[in-house]
Swiss-Prot record:
Residues 1-15 have a biased composition (Polar residues). Necessary for protein translocation in the endoplasmic reticulum. Residues 41-52 have a biased composition (Low complexity). It comes from the Eukaryota. Residues 1-72 are cytoplasmic. The chain crosses the membrane at residues 73-93. The keyword tRNA processing does not apply. It comes from Schizosaccharomyces pombe (strain 972 / ATCC 24843) (Fission yeast). The lineage of its organism: Eukaryota, Fungi, Dikarya, Ascomycota, Taphrinomycotina. GO terms for molecular function: guanyl-nucleotide exchange factor activity. The gene is sbh1. Its main location: endoplasmic reticulum. This is Protein transport protein sec61 subunit beta. GO terms for cellular component: endoplasmic reticulum; membrane; Sec61 translocon complex.
Amino acid sequence: MSSTKASGSVKNSAASAPGGPKSQIRRRAAVEKNTKESNSGPAGARAAGAPGSTPTLLKLYTDEASGFKVDPVVVMVLSVGFIASVFLLHIVARILKKFASE
């Protein structure tokens, strides 16, 4: 069944919707949910950005973070040292493999 409008014909039957009628119902519910969420205010103090509601990951990189205080240079030196040790282990493994095969 179709109804005609000034711009052309549009099908009204639910069976013609892509994915069937259940998909159309899900899409409609999702649109209603999105409009309801966008119209409502923050759900709680955490969503409103109240003090003390910062995620833990962001606290790791601030001066107020609890725990170890490590200088960025120390982190870089340890990182490069770890990468170098892995590189050297690969080289040693190749050398040992070469001598073991002879």
